[in-house]
């Protein structure tokens, strides 16, 4: 892969439904078993992953002080773009 390509990494996500019906991810488990806490969700929108392919709800999250995108696909699976 070149430096600009990415691939999908499907992850397990701990999420909550708020009382007003929003779905918010709280943490995810990376492929090596490491759990990453999501400090903040800064944006939620329907979008395509231009790096890895796929479409769904894109959550822009702050994880370990860095911005990351977590996608919830229409098939009810979560993925992260591997860097």
Predicted regions and their residues:
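Cysteine-centric segments in proteins
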Residues: 1-83
């Amino acid at each position: 892969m070149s430096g600009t390509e990415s691939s999908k990494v499907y992850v397990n996500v701990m999420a909550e439904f708020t009382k007003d019906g929003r779905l918010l991810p709280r943490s995810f488990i990376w492929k090596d078993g490491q759990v990453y806490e999501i400090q903040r969700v800064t944006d939620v929108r329907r979008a395509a992953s231009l790096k890895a392919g796929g479409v769904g709800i894109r959550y822009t999250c702050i994880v370990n002080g860095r911005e990351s995108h977590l996608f919830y696909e229409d098939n009810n699976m979560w993925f992260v773009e591997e860097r």
